[in-house]
Every structure is written in C-alpha cells, then in structure tokens.
A protein has these predicted regions:
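Conserved PLP-binding active-site segment in aminotransferase class I/II-type PLP enzymes
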Residues: 1-70, 74, 130, 144, ...
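Conserved PLP-anchoring active-site segment centered on the Schiff-base-forming lysine
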Residues: 65-122, 127, 323
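Active-site phosphate-binding strand-loop segment of PLP-dependent enzymes
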Residues: 108-191, 197-199, 203-207, 366
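Active-site-adjacent capping/gating segments
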Residues: 162, 169-170, 174-176, 233-240, ...
Length: 394
C-alpha cells in the first residue's frame, strides 16, 4: 500500500558533523573496534547519566544478555517482566532457564504496575525487569526499587525506548541495579542502525563486563614480554560466565559521542510535537493517551493511544482500516502481549493475569512519529485522524 504518511525505519537525519565523525574513523582509526572512540563514548555516556559505569555493546538485547549473566539467574529462579513490552525484554532471561512471570500494566500509564508486581513476588523471585515503554519513565519507579530492595530483588531497567527522559533530575537507567539502552535505527538517536549501552551500580560487577563482552579477552598485566604467552588473555576471571562478542565498533562509538551532544535538543523537538498532537485531540474521547505527570519524564519515542470505541461503536481495527486505506496514514499496533507469543507459550510461559495489558493491546494505536516527518505531513496526519474519527461516528 502506498502511504502519504508512513511508518519510517529511520529516526533521524545525520548532520555533517556526525557523518564526518564516521568517515574520520573509517580513514584513520586503528583498531576499528575496542579502541579509543569506544572509551570516549562510554565516558561521555557515563557523564550524561550521572557518572555510573557504562559499556558499549552491539544492541540493547545484548545489554540485557550481559545483565542476565551478571544477575546469575538460573533454573528455579523467577523473573517478573511486564507482559506488554517488546520480546527482547524477556528473551535474555528466558535463555537462563528461569521462570518468566508476566506482570500487568497500569491502565493510565500503560506501564508496569507495582500492585501487579507485588502480587507476583515469591521467595523465588530474583529479578524484576521494568520497561520505560514509549519513552516514559514509570512514575513510581523509585517506589518499585524500594520495594524490590526490601525483598532483596534486583531491578533491571529496560531503557531501550526512553533515553532522554528524566524523573526528579535522574536519568532513566539509574534508579535500579542495571540499565540497558538502545541505539537501534528507530530510536531517538541511532548509531548506524544498531548499538547499545549497559550501565550498573556495582563496581565489582562492572569490572567483569569488558571480558564478558569480548570473548574473555583483556590485556595481560605485568608481562615480561608482550608476546608471552599470547597477545590477549582469555583467562580473565569472570567467575565461570561464558563470554560473548558484543563489541561496538569505533565508527558507531564516534558517532554516538557526537549524537549525545544534540540528544536534549532532539528530545525537546519530540516533546513539542507530541504536545501539539495530544492537544489536537482534547475533544476526541476516542483516543486515550498515556497519563503524564511530569513532562521531563517522557522522551516521546513513540506516539501511542488507546482507542475507545464507545463514541462510535466501532473497533480499533475499523479505525486503522479507514485511516490507512482512505487517508493513507500508516498507524500500527504494538506490542503483542508476551504470554500470547507462540515462542513463550511453547516454553511454558503462556499464562498471565494481565487484564489491563490485554485491554490496552487490543485497542492500542501507534502513530507515525519520526522526527524527520515534515510539518505539513504531521498536520495532515492530525487532520486525517480527526476526520476519520468523526466519520466513524456516522
């Protein structure tokens, strides 16, 4: 189908400075991975989030893989995860053999509910994964972390969609024990389509990450000769954890450092557009948006709403059909509840008591919201949605 306003796989346009940063690495960097540009990016990102240790990786899923390793989750343990999130929030913990337990979401924020978490905690609960979905920090994240600490449970923040959001002056990913960030091609900033960062509070755990991230390799210390016994050491003490190769390239790292410099301005632009969009529908009860108590806590990665059909007697799917076929606006649906996935069903995780998540998913709409969309296309989308909603009323 040919759309006038389509769902884009590209979140931003690179500046000449950003392009030149990549070209410079292509021409001059030696090595092309695990070099000075990675160190600079990790340092810049650490400064941005307040000083916690940070490590660049290939993507946020691999950041969560490393976190799953470091939490030592295993068969017999339980990991609580919201049922409404992208599958990558859960798969790394599923690999461990632990039991995945699905938590419900709050009906107003569409984010994981503390009450649901409390109802699911058992003596076997080892980790709670919270997801700051659509760009919004969970409003009561501090309460969730406090509760988890009282139960000796680790908190992992999936910040893949929320970079740029802050709550009480704290950046997402710094409330819990671990944080994972994404620079995928559709995220608010992207390092050539893929990329990620892991952050954590525990300094002792942080020392293990370079080895786990890169096949156990680390420079020999106090060597008499640089070649004895070999150029790199795979005997680094990582306490029995099998290492991976999740290395971020030098080109991606150099680009990431430059992109961080305009993250705040990009976030401001997204907030302004999101505000305009939401205000355009104050007289349209058919669309229920996330409840936002603190604007700075939202980086507006995505623009989502719950379709309420009481006004028109129509369904979400009828709305999407009209919007796409007549007005050529490509709105989509996200994210399939994880307990409904065939993968998780086959693994024994097909049960959940998540009525809010089910209701939201069955009626949710995600509108195109890439920053490269022209103002005229953005206005056209708003006008088309209004017209479609009125048309559905009959």
């Amino acid at each position: 189908m040919d759309f006038k306003v389509k769902w884009s796989g590209k979140s931003i346009e690179y500046t000449e400075e950003e392009i030149n940063a990549v070209v410079n690495v292509m021409r001059t960097a030696d090595p092309q991975t695990q070099g000075k540009y990675l160190i600079e990016f990790e340092s810049a990102f650490s400064k941005y989030i307040g000083g916690q240790p940070c490590f660049g990786v290939t993507n946020a899923t691999h950041a969560l893989e490393l976190i799953a390793d470091l939490t030592d989750v295993k068969k017999g343990d339980e990991v609580i995860i919201p049922s409404h999130t992208y599958c990558a929030s859960a798969i790394p913990f599923g690999r461990t053999g632990a039991k995945l337990v699905w938590a419900d979401v709050d009906s107003d924020t569409f984010l994981v509910s503390l009450d649901s978490i409390k109802s699911l905690v058992t003596e076997r609960t080892k980790v709670i994964v919270v997801v700051h979905l659509y760009g919004m920090i969970i409003p009561n994240i501090e309460e969730i972390v406090s509760y988890a600490k009282s139960k000796n449970i680790l908190v992992v923040e999936d910040c893949a969609q929320s970079l740029g959001a802050k709550l009480n002056s704290k950046v997402c990913g710094t409330f819990g024990d671990f944080g994972a960030y994404s620079f995928h091609g559709q995220k608010n900033i992207t390092t050539l389509g893929e990329g990620g960062i892991i952050t954590l509070k525990d300094e002792a755990q942080a020392k293990k990450i370079p080895g786990i991230r890169h096949n156990g390799h680390a420079p020999f210390l106090n060597k008499i000769e640089y070649w004895i016994p070999a150029m790199s050491n795979v005997d680094l003490d990582i306490e029995g954890i099998w290492p991976h190769n999740f290395s971020l390239t030098e080109a991606q790292s150099a680009l990431g450092t430059v992109l961080l410099g305009r993250l705040d301005s990009l976030t401001t632009s997204r907030r302004e557009r999101a505000k305009k969009f939401r205000q355009s529908f104050v007289d349209f009860p058919e669309l229920k948006f996330q409840k936002i108590s603190n604007e700075s806590s939202h980086s507006h990665h995505l623009l989502v709403a719950q379709f309420i059909g009481k006004e028109s007697g129509k369904s979400r799917d009828e709305f999407l059909s009209l919007l796409s076929k007549k007005y050529k606006v490509q709105a989509i649906v996200q994210y399939y509840p994880l307990n409904r996935y065939d993968l998780f069903k086959k693994m024994g995780f097909g049960h959940a008591n998540c009525p809010n998540a089910d209701l939201f998913f069955d009626n949710m709409v995600s509108f195109p919201f890439h920053i490269t969309m022209t103002e005229s296309d953005f206005d056209y989308m708003i006008d088309s949605i209004k017209t479609a909603l009125i048309e559905l009323r009959g």
